[in-house]
From Swiss-Prot:
Designated name of the protein: dITP/XTP pyrophosphatase
Binding residue positions for substrate: 12-17, 74, 157-160, 180, 185-186
Family to which this protein belongs: Belongs to the HAM1 NTPase family.
Record's keyword annotation contains Metal-binding: yes
Length: 199
């Protein structure tokens, strides 16, 4: 990136993501601000792909803040369900209220009779310099695993207790944070984003 921004707005209200991205950019002298600081209204996510929704959120945040913006969209995709839950992962069992337990039970029921238990976590990050940026920077991470019918582990959220990694012999929720922060879909996308930003 030829001109390094001093500030970036994160198109999310998630405190965990704000901390993660804040820590990532801090060594480069870049401050990551939450979109709540600019009273940015929630962005509609009408698209059927992670990248289109992340791009919409990034442009929305940049347009309202006047700053470069970073957005992510992520979820889990089951091969036997043609990629579902996909972009609907967070609200798979409904959104009133969102519930990890309900989402997991719904996906477990849908995969119960399927022979193919392969699934993957996907994270797409989009960075725009301004709302009309014709060259958004897009990074993607994919973490391959298997759906495990029995949950295990406490170090995670979402679908982590059911997301089994044969190479580790553990679910994502059983991995320690150091391994997770190195191998996860989000870690892969962040590494690619940093390479593309060339900070």
């Amino acid at each position: 990136m030829s001109e390094k921004p001093e500030k970036i707005v994160l198109a999310s209200g998630n405190a965990g993501k704000l901390k993660e991205f804040g820590n990532l950019f801090e060594p480069y002298g870049i401050t990551v601000l939450p979109q709540s600081e600019f009273s940015i209204p929630e962005c509609p996510e009408p698209y059927s792909t992670f990248v289109e929704n992340a791009l919409a959120k990034a442009r929305h945040a940049a347009g309202h803040s006047g700053l470069p913006a970073l957005a992510d969209d992520s979820g889990i995709c089951a091969a036997a369900l043609n990629g579902a839950p996909g972009i609907h992962s967070a609200r798979y069992a409904g959104s009133n209220p969102k519930s990890d337990t309900a989402n997991n039970l719904k996906l477990a029921a849908e995969l119960a009779g399927k022979a193919d238990k392969s699934c993957c976590y996907v994270c797409v990050l989009v960075f725009v310099r301004h709302k009309d940026d014709p060259r958004p920077i897009i990074a993607e991470g994919v973490w391959h695993g298997q759906w495990n019918g029995v949950p295990a582990g406490e170090n995670g959220f979402g679908y982590d207790p059911y997301f089994y990694l044969p190479g580790h012999g553990k679910t994502a929720a059983e991995l320690d944070s150091e391994v997770k922060n190195r191998e996860s879909h989000r870690a892969q996308a962040l590494a690619e984003l940093l390479r593309k930003l060339a900070l």
